């Protein structure tokens, strides 16, 4: 009986040790590498949703005037302001760069203040802000070169009030732009109408000459056909 109990205890002891050895790694064996965390399957979708949400929020801000839209369009002054000569645009560009003290491609409020003082027409703070606002297409509170040209375009078209700061800028600039209509908008547009009238007259004369040549060609063909018929009649 005692031997059976001892054998039973030994058997249980062996089973217990074998169970522990199965849980422990073998001596000298390299430990299994820890599994790397896998990114959740919804991560790309979450990023796409975040980007779309950011785009929608920016569009809402632009529509509400809280953000400025990015301008990707390339500015071509000669095509956008065809009423100005290339020389005039070059002169206006030189003037713009002269007062762009920060060399950032814009004339800000302080630079505009200095410009108007040098031109002999100083403006109040509110007056300067009003000048910028009148041509500030992108609502950034400063003048780009395109907006600077727009001042002279509006002056030539008679779209500025005579006593406005922008009209003073256009009139007092050192550049002679009278021929372009800034100081004589009426003469400018009358000259433009006259040029269009001359062009229309030239086109009318050219068309009349073309019609006359067509009629002469038709008459010549009729005469040739009649001659061939007459010749055929005599040959018969």
UniProtKB/Swiss-Prot annotation:
Chain segments annotated as coiled-coil in the UniProt record: none
Chain residues that bind Ca(2+) 2: 136, 138, 140, 142, 147
Classification via InterPro entries: EF-hand-dom_pair, EF_hand_dom, EFHD1/2
GO CC aspect terms: mitochondrial inner membrane
Keyword set includes Transcription: no
Pfam families: EF-hand_7
Region Disordered, annotated ranges: 1-48
GO biological process: regulation of cellular hyperosmotic salinity response
Primary subcellular site in the record, as a coarse category: mitochondrion
Listed Pro residues bias regions: 28-42
Name recorded for this polypeptide: EF-hand domain-containing protein D1
């Amino acid at each position: 009986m005692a031997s059976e109990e001892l054998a039973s205890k030994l058997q249980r002891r062996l089973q217990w040790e074998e169970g522990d050895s199965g849980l422990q790694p073998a001596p000298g064996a390299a430990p299994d590498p820890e599994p790397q965390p896998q990114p959740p399957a919804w991560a790309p979708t979450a990023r796409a949703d975040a980007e779309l949400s950011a785009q929608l929020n920016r569009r809402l801000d632009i529509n509400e005037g809280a953000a400025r839209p990015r301008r990707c369009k390339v500015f071509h002054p000669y095509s956008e302001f065809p009423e100005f000569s290339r020389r005039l645009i070059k002169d206006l560009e030189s003037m713009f760069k002269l007062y762009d003290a920060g060399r950032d491609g814009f004339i800000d409020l302080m630079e505009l203040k200095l410009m108007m003082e040098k031109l002999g027409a100083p403006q109040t703070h509110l007056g300067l802000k009003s000048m910028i606002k009148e041509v500030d297409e992108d609502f950034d509170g400063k003048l780009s070169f395109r907006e600077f040209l727009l001042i002279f375009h509006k002056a030539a078209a008679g779209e500025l009030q005579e006593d406005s700061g922008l009209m003073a800028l256009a009139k007092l600039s050192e550049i002679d732009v009278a021929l372009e209509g800034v100081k004589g908008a009426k003469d400018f547009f009358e000259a433009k109408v006259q040029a269009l009238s001359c062009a229309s007259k030239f086109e009318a004369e050219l068309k009349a000459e073309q019609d006359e040549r067509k009629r002469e060609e038709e008459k010549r063909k009729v005469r040739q056909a009649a001659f061939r018929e007459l010749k055929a009649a005599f040959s018969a």
